[in-house]
A protein has these predicted regions:
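Long, K/E/R/D-enriched contiguous segments that form extended
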Residues: 293-328, 394, 448, 452-454, ...
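Catalytic Zn2+-binding segment of zinc metalloproteases
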Residues: 390-404
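Post-HExxH zinc-binding segment in Zn-dependent metallohydrolases
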Residues: 409-437, 447-449, 453, 527
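Auxiliary, metal-adjacent structural segments of Zn-dependent hydrolase domains
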Residues: 300, 306-366, 378-379
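A well-structured
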Residues: 1-308, 595-597
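Short pre-active-site segment immediately N-terminal to the catalytic Zn-binding motif
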Residues: 369-386
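Flexible, glycine/threonine-enriched loop-and-boundary segments that flank and lead into catalytic domains
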Residues: 342-369, 492, 496-518
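C-terminal, non-catalytic "cap/extension" segments appended to globular domains
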Residues: 10-13, 20, 24, 109-116, ...
Length: 597
């Protein structure tokens, strides 16, 4: 790992995404932006007239959304690779403003549709010529009690940029303005600490390096704690306001009901994970023993327990491994992955000013998905490649097999395809290294960590979100102190039976960007539970299971998300898949103990 982040221009072109596939340059984007704004003004002429020709109004509504998508995506992606680039940030700000203008100009549309007679709406939804829009109309009718009169909808739309402010402030603070102290390396040198490099340091064999990085991150966030608490409070208060304005009982209801996910799924997840905390404690106790520690601290949780085996993988070797591990998905699937590798889909390496983390952006029907990585040469980041490409392939199949109004799959299933890729690749590696005790132990450790960080950790995050929003809904203040206390107590619940829960872990909630997209992190946990089952089916049943899985990938939002998963044979309306996945965690732990004995 380089001690200092490279500048973007120092990274070879084959490891950067190519946004010219969207627009050849910023001038073309400017022209497209002008066209979208003109189309928005034209669409505004429908105000008060939707009832005259509702079918045509629906078509033009979706056409405008499709026209705007590349304008927004180009600006967003352009800004992600250098948050310090004022030109790119200017484009992103203008795209955001465009979104608010369009939302305002189009805000009358759904209320006017909903003012139509129910029988007419049902007739339009049943019209074969309007089949592309039937899912939209079904959801619209279902959301009728939560749609406001046109003038009120317009006011909410005008709040768009204000509502986005907490997330934007958080991003600017953490990606641009915030800097971390250097990490002291064992040889006496120092290395630059960023959110992008933290994952490497926290896995270090050197406990001093781990503690230096952990304290550097947590204490720096803590020094901005009051600011971040105020920022997060703004985000939560907006969630509560939006929910109440739309006549939902809670902010959680407002997030989950439109997705057709019962809140019992959320509650089942927390309940089942709580029941499995003793197994987590068993795993943590084994970690403590294998690491030979008198005390297991929070900065000891990520380093591999198998110290005499190292799987260091360059990006190119990692991608080869992903292709090999995902062969069960079929040759057409692999062909698209190869295209992604060389076709300008992926931005690979960390660089100065680049956003941390990883994501896939799959909204561009006429181009291809884009993937942002911050690749370090380790096994974890190899799985990240498989994970993000799982998102991309889900988008690709949905976009290919569904019309635009039905192609945007639900948040609830958004993590299933990505995590299924990880699980399938893991099974391949466990089989490949079955006779290599060191490698097998290392991989089992990684699999256990995937469960700990994806099921237990994300469920803890989900529980924190529920606590924070419930506090706000009950009129309790969200301050640095109250939020940090709640987060610390959750860490004690999940880890305290075995771990020394360091005081500054109370600051960790401050660095989680997903909290600004409320009630989302739980889908990582439910997604893994579904994905483990899907991967088992694909590997055991072969082609028939792959066909069923492809139906799920291709479903988009044509059917409700629970039903989409049922196409692949998984029923997430019951706690059974969660319980079964946690059973896999227990079995994997037993296997790991046997290997390490």
């Amino acid at each position: 790992m380089a001690a200092k982040l490279r500048k973007r221009e120092e990274i070879p072109a084959q490891y950067k995404w190519d946004l010219s596939h969207i627009y050849p340059d910023d001038a073309a984007w400017e022209a497209a932006l002008a066209d979208v704004l003109a189309s928005g003004k034209k669409f505004a002429a429908w105000e008060g007239k939707v009832a005259e020709n509702p079918r045509q109004a629906i078509r033009e509504y979706f056409d405008l959304n499709q026209q705007a998508e590349p304008v927004f995506s180009y600006a967003f992606l352009r800004g992600e690779t250098d948050n310090g680039d004022s030109v790119a940030q200017g484009l992103r700000a203008r795209a955001s403003q465009m979104g608010v203008q369009l939302s305002t100009a189009m805000s009358f549309f759904e209320p006017e549709l909903l003012s139509l007679d129910d029988a007419l709406l049902a007739e339009i939804a049943a019209d074969p010529a309007m089949a592309d829009y039937d899912a939209f109309l079904r959801n619209l009718i279902r959301q009728k009690p939560h749609t406001l009169p046109a003038e009120q909808e317009k006011l909410l739309a005008m709040m768009g940029q204000v509502a986005q402010a907490p997330n934007h402030i958080f991003g600017m603070l953490t990606d641009v303005d915030m800097s971390f102290p250097p990490v002291q390396m064992p040889d006496g040198t120092t290395a630059e600490l960023t959110e992008g490099t933290y994952s490497q340091f926290i896995r270090s064999d050197s406990r001093d390096v781990r503690k230096s990085a952990f304290d550097g991150i947590m204490n720096t966030y803590g020094s901005f704690g009051s600011t971040i608490a105020a920022t997060y409070n703004g985000s939560v208060q907006n969630d509560v306001f939006q929910a109440r304005a739309r006549h939902y009982a809670t902010a959680r209801d407002a997030r989950m009901e439109p997705l057709e996910i019962p809140t019992s799924v959320y509650d089942n997840l927390i309940s089942e994970v709580h029941a499995a905390i003793p197994v987590l404690n068993e795993y943590l106790a084994l970690r403590k023993a294998l690491m030979g520690l008198d005390e297991l601290h929070m900065y000891d949780l990520y380093t591999p327990m198998v110290k005499d085996f190292h799987m260091e993988l360059s990006y190119d070797k990692a991608f080869d491994l992903v292709l090999e591990g995902l062969k069960p998905m079929g040759e057409d699937y692999l062909a698209k992955l190869r295209e992604a590798r060389v076709g300008g889909w992926i931005d690979v390496y960390p660089s100065k000013g680049k956003s941390s983390g990883a994501f896939s952006s799959g909204n561009l029907r006429d181009v291809h998905p884009y993937v942002l990585l911050n690749h370090n040469d380790n096994l974890s980041d190899t799985f990240t490649i498989a994970h993000e490409l799982g998102h991309s392939m889900h988008s690709f199949y949905s976009n290919t097999n569904q019309p635009a109004p039905k192609s945007d799959y639900s948040l609830f299933v958004a993590e299933v395809a990505s995590t299924c890729n990880e699980a399938t690749m893991m099974r391949h590696l466990l089989k490949t290294f079955a006779d290599d005790k060191k490698a097998l132990a290392y991989l089992l450790n990684h699999f256990l960590e995937q469960f700990r960080t994806t099921v237990f950790r994300q469920t803890m995050f989900a529980e924190f979100e529920l606590i924070a929003h419930t506090m706000a809904e009950q009129g309790q203040p969200l301050t640095r102190e109250s939020l940090s206390k709640a987060y610390y107590e959750l860490n004690q619940k999940y880890y305290g039976a075995v771990c020394t829960v360091d005081e500054n872990i109370a600051n960790e909630w401050m660095r989680i960007p997903h909290f600004y997209r409320s009630y989302y992190v739980y889908v990582y946990a439910t997604g893994l539970c579904a994905a483990v089952s899907l991967s088992d089916k694909i590997l055991s049943e072969g082609e028939s299971a792959v066909r069923d899985y492809r139906k799920f990938l291709s479903a988009g939002c044509a059917v409700p998300p629970i039903d989409a998963l049922k196409l692949a044979g998984i029923d997430m309306s019951s706690p059974e898949p969660i319980r079964r996945a946690l059973g896999v965690f227990k079995d994997t732990l037993a296997q790991f103990k046997a290997v390490m004995a």
